[in-house]
């Protein structure tokens, strides 16, 4: 039976519908937001896989080309592997939903969001999050939702709910916030150096506006929700709890005071092994399963680390809650790279490299909106040796794509306009050591590498990751968190920005949301940490270098008559290809006649410019040209004096004396100077060799 609810959300009309499509899924909802239509389905396994010790949730977001009336390109003419944007939206759906599943629920769950219809004025990400929340609410799974999501813009000092992609171009903010009725769970944003106060109010504005969504999902659930699963959270085994505490608490307390990450991990791993040996069923008829023993040891470590912090005792590495780890910076570390920096903060290290290219190096993206050209790329690579592990090297994983996009958001606001700096920019962050906050190390390293490359950024940018430990009303905000503090804490709160304001904010909560006061304190503490990091960065390099690297391309610009573009390009691109091969340059010609010549050698650029000028030059009567003999006849010779332009030197114009045979004076391929005498009405050109002497 079909059920639906409708509501107004900002400027959009939204309908949630279920009961007609995908009826064999545990939950299925079609979200229609002004003709952007997304089908979201939820399916869960009824049993837990043997030995399962984590929650296997998978979210797949996919855009169908037919949604925008397009046929896919390529040989196969069908959708292939997920694009970067699809991967990012998959993560955006996953992040606010994951923490709301009941503790101990380990059944595999798959959420699929499929874009069926696309209105360019409505981005599919917000409908997808809403649809996932609604489908979960209908499924009967142990999910503590619903949640809602909203996009917030900031135009003319006013907040805008769910602005269109076109409106976002005039907005100083692009923020997505998701949360439950009472608390915020997730924030993803890019901003134009806005204050912490403006950012916080944007989050709260979005949270207030999304209440209508939560109300509507609850209305739909009242009509069509399936019965709740007969599932109960596993009861705590008090005996195992006691055994683990009695035998291993003292060792765990000592282990989590070891500052060196690898030594600490090895010590904790040994404690786990000893616990399994002592309490596991393999060696003890009255023992417990290995996964259960490890779970209880981990839970004890969780309690130890959190309790120490809430009691205001030193953190794992001995710091207080507001101290940033020691920072070291080196720039120009790679002699042939256009710009490079090695940024190390504690045991987290990023080697970041900036490369400058031409417009031809820009990335072309095939999206539902058509082909999009992107002249700024930031790629994040998490190498397995950075955490002392062996791993596969291949295409980037979801996490790497997400971290790269976050770092890019942090830098976009301070990049120069393309008309002021006509380069394609690629930044690559290689994580060579990792112990928390590697994405924010990438922001810092990228800012340094860009300045080292001579990119005229408006101002330096730094990033910092904040953490949270919360028990009841008691909480502690942690500055510059370690990997273990991220793992054992309740929040990952990343802030990037300049000394002026915030450029990117990302927040993920592992508990059932946080309050405005916690966010305010986290932003304030992050501001202090960011200014400290910027101060250290400025000691290494305070402004972009005045000169580009000797190995970076230089641009020379000129303009030609649009009627001459075809002459410069030549048949099938032969002419321009010949110039680039001859000079070793890269040449771009726009439809308006603007020409950009890129070369690492000034002489090569000048040579390419001269060749183009010769092609587009208009012949001038009385001017002397360097010419080449192309054909000899009985009455004279034809010579090319400009690319694509020939003229005749009559036998009488070859020399001051009488010439009986042209071949006695000239040969094909010979180069001589000629003077242009006349261009007749038919465009025929008369040249003279003797007048040029």
UniProtKB/Swiss-Prot annotation:
<dbReference type="GO" id="GO:0006396">
    <property type="term" value="P:RNA processing"/>
</dbReference>
<keyword id="KW-0479">Metal-binding</keyword>
<feature type="domain" description="KH">
    <location>
        <begin position="553"/>
        <end position="612"/>
    </location>
</feature>
<comment type="subunit">
    <text>Component of the RNA degradosome, which is a multiprotein complex involved in RNA processing and mRNA degradation.</text>
</comment>
<keyword id="KW-0548">Nucleotidyltransferase</keyword>
<dbReference type="InterPro" id="IPR001247">
    <property type="entry name" value="ExoRNase_PH_dom1"/>
</dbReference>
<dbReference type="InterPro" id="IPR012162">
    <property type="entry name" value="PNPase"/>
</dbReference>
<dbReference type="GO" id="GO:0005829">
    <property type="term" value="C:cytosol"/>
</dbReference>
<keyword id="KW-0460">Magnesium</keyword>
<comment type="similarity">
    <text>Belongs to the polyribonucleotide nucleotidyltransferase family.</text>
</comment>
<dbReference type="InterPro" id="IPR015848">
    <property type="entry name" value="PNPase_PH_RNA-bd_bac/org-type"/>
</dbReference>
<dbReference type="GO" id="GO:0003723">
    <property type="term" value="F:RNA binding"/>
</dbReference>
<dbReference type="InterPro" id="IPR004088">
    <property type="entry name" value="KH_dom_type_1"/>
</dbReference>
<dbReference type="InterPro" id="IPR003029">
    <property type="entry name" value="S1_domain"/>
</dbReference>
<dbReference type="InterPro" id="IPR036345">
    <property type="entry name" value="ExoRNase_PH_dom2_sf"/>
</dbReference>
<feature type="binding site">
    <location>
        <position position="492"/>
    </location>
    <ligand>
        <name>Mg(2+)</name>
    </ligand>
</feature>
<dbReference type="GO" id="GO:0006402">
    <property type="term" value="P:mRNA catabolic process"/>
</dbReference>
<comment type="function">
    <text>Involved in mRNA degradation. Catalyzes the phosphorolysis of single-stranded polyribonucleotides processively in the 3'- to 5'-direction.</text>
</comment>
<dbReference type="GO" id="GO:0000175">
    <property type="term" value="F:3'-5'-RNA exonuclease activity"/>
</dbReference>
<dbReference type="Pfam" id="PF03726">
    <property type="entry name" value="PNPase"/>
</dbReference>
<feature type="domain" description="S1 motif">
    <location>
        <begin position="622"/>
        <end position="690"/>
    </location>
</feature>
<feature type="binding site">
    <location>
        <position position="486"/>
    </location>
    <ligand>
        <name>Mg(2+)</name>
    </ligand>
</feature>
<dbReference type="Pfam" id="PF00575">
    <property type="entry name" value="S1"/>
</dbReference>
<keyword id="KW-0694">RNA-binding</keyword>
<keyword id="KW-0808">Transferase</keyword>
<dbReference type="InterPro" id="IPR020568">
    <property type="entry name" value="Ribosomal_Su5_D2-typ_SF"/>
</dbReference>
<protein>
    <recommendedName>
        <fullName>Polyribonucleotide nucleotidyltransferase</fullName>
        <ecNumber>2.7.7.8</ecNumber>
    </recommendedName>
</protein>
<dbReference type="InterPro" id="IPR012340">
    <property type="entry name" value="NA-bd_OB-fold"/>
</dbReference>
<dbReference type="Pfam" id="PF00013">
    <property type="entry name" value="KH_1"/>
</dbReference>
<dbReference type="Pfam" id="PF03725">
    <property type="entry name" value="RNase_PH_C"/>
</dbReference>
<dbReference type="InterPro" id="IPR036612">
    <property type="entry name" value="KH_dom_type_1_sf"/>
</dbReference>
<keyword id="KW-0963">Cytoplasm</keyword>
<dbReference type="GO" id="GO:0004654">
    <property type="term" value="F:polyribonucleotide nucleotidyltransferase activity"/>
</dbReference>
<dbReference type="InterPro" id="IPR004087">
    <property type="entry name" value="KH_dom"/>
</dbReference>
<dbReference type="InterPro" id="IPR027408">
    <property type="entry name" value="PNPase/RNase_PH_dom_sf"/>
</dbReference>
<dbReference type="Pfam" id="PF01138">
    <property type="entry name" value="RNase_PH"/>
</dbReference>
<dbReference type="InterPro" id="IPR015847">
    <property type="entry name" value="ExoRNase_PH_dom2"/>
</dbReference>
<dbReference type="GO" id="GO:0000287">
    <property type="term" value="F:magnesium ion binding"/>
</dbReference>
């Amino acid at each position: 039976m079909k059920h639906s609810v409708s509501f107004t959300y900002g400027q959009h009309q939204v309908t949630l519908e279920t009961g007609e499509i995908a009826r064999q899924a545990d939950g299925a909802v079609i979200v229609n937001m002004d003709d952007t239509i997304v089908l979201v389905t939820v399916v869960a396994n009824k049993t837990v896989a043997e030995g399962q010790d984590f929650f296997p949730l998978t979210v797949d977001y996919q855009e169908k080309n037919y949604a925008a009336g397009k046929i896919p390109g390529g040989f196969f003419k069908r959708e292939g592997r997920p694009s970067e944007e699809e991967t990012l939206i998959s993560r955006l759906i996953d992040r606010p939903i994951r923490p709301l599943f009941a503790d101990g629920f380990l059944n595999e769950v798959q959420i699929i969001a499929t874009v069926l219809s696309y209105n360019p004025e409505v981005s599919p990400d917000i409908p997808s999050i809403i649809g996932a929340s609604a489908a979960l609410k209908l499924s009967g799974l142990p999910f503590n939702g619903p949640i809602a999501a909203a996009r917030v813009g900031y135009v003319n000092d006013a907040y805008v709910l769910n602005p269109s992609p076109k409106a976002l171009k005039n907005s100083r903010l692009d923020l997505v916030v998701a949360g439950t009725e009472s608390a915020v769970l997730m924030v993803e944003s890019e901003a134009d150096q806005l204050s912490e106060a403006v950012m916080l109010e944007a989050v709260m504005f979005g949270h207030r506006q999304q209440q209508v969504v939560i109300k509507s999902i609850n209305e739909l659930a009242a009509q069509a929700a399936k019965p709740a699963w007969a599932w109960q959270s596993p009861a705590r085994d008090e005996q195992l709890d006691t055994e683990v505490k009695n035998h291993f608490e003292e060792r765990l307390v000592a282990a989590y005071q070891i500052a060196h990450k690898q030594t600490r991990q090895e010590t904790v791993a040994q404690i786990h092994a000893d616990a399994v040996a002592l309490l596991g069923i393999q060696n003890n008829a009255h023992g417990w399963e290995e996964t259960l023993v490890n779970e209880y040891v981990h839970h004890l470590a969780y309690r130890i680390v959190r309790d120490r912090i809430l009691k205001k005792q030193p953190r794992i590495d001995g710091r207080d809650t507001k101290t940033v780890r020691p920072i070291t910076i080196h720039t120009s570390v790679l002699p042939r790279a256009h710009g490079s920096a090695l940024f190390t903060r504690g045991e987290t290290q990023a080697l970041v490299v900036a490369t400058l290219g031409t417009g031809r190096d820009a990335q072309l993206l095939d999206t539902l909106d058509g082909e999009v050209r992107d002249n700024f790329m930031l790629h994040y690579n998490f190498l397995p040796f950075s955490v002392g592990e062996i791993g596969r090297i291949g295409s980037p994983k979801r996490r790497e794509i997400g971290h790269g996009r976050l770092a890019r958001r942090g830098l976009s606001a301070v990049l120069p306009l393309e008309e002021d700096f006509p380069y394609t920019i690629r930044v690559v962050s290689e994580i060579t050591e990792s112990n928390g906050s590697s994405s924010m190390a990438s922001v810092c390293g990228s800012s340094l590498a860009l300045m080292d490359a001579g990119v005229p950024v408006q101002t330096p940018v730094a990033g910092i990751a904040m953490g949270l430990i919360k028990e009841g009303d008691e909480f502690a905000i942690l500055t510059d968190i370690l990997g273990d503090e991220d793992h054992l804490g309740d929040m990952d709160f990343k802030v990037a920005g300049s000394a002026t304001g915030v450029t990117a904010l990302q927040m993920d909560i592992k508990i059932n949301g946080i309050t405005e006061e916690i966010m305010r304190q986290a932003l304030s503490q992050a501001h202090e940490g960011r200014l400290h990091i910027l101060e250290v960065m400025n000691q290494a390099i305070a402004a972009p270098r005045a000169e580009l690297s000797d190995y970076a391309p230089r641009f020379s610009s000129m303009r030609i008559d649009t009627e001459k573009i075809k002459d410069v390009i030549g048949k099938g691109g032969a002419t321009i290809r010949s110039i680039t091969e001859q000079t070793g340059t890269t040449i771009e010609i726009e439809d308006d006649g603007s020409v950009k010549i890129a070369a690492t050698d000034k002489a090569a650029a000048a040579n390419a410019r001269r060749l183009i000028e010769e092609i587009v030059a208009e012949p001038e009567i009385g001017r002397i040209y360097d010419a080449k003999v192309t054909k000899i006849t009985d009455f004279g010779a034809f010579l090319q004096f400009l690319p694509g332009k020939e003229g005749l030197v009559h036998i009488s114009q070859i020399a001051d004396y009488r010439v009986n045979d042209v071949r006695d004076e000239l040969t094909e391929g010979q180069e001589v100077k000629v003077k242009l005498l006349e261009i007749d009405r038919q465009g025929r050109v008369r040249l003279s060799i003797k007048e040029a002497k």
